[in-house]
Amino acid sequence: MTYQWREDGADADLLLDGASQEITVTDTNGTVSTQTWSYPSRTDCLSCHNPHAGYLLGLNTHQLNGDFTYPSTGRSDNQLRTLNHLGLFSPRIDESAIASYLSSVPLTDTSVPVETRVRSYLDANCAHCHRPDALATSFDTRFTTPFDEQNLIDGSVLYDLGVEDARVIVPRSIQRSILHRRVS
């Protein structure tokens, strides 16, 4: 099912069919452009929610392995530990092992290397499609894939967006880097 936010942002409405909407996007240089945002229909579900993505496009262990301040109590604790205490894992996880689990981080967390922040962002926002055997397989943005196996640097792209000799990321060439255009 697809929801579309109302103009005031107060709530979202269920769309029974697919739809598209023109949105205004301002890039990092201040350039304003119009982009079409597509809302998939119910018949489009399996194009993303498929066996290669594990059917569920949701959180991964490494996305939950970090502290979170719970607004209702003001307490902060590791989300995996909290969910374990609430009995939401079956079987329960060994809490002494949590520290050894991978942990992704927010893009804004400047206390960690930029590579970790970018890999965390790409995993959360792109890896449901950009992974082996999925629909868009020219590169792999999963957090767990070693960097040298991701095919991001000078990796080929399926859709060049009209950019001559486009690649996923081209060192020292933001103009030819499709990833920059996609996330801007």
Predicted feature residues:
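Electron-transfer interface patches adjacent to heme c in soluble/periplasmic c-type cytochromes
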Residues: F68-V118, H128-D133, D140-S184
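Periplasmic/extracellular electron-transfer cofactor-ligation site
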Residues: R42-L57, A124-E149
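Extended surface/linker regions that mediate inter-domain or inter-protein docking
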Residues: M1-S120
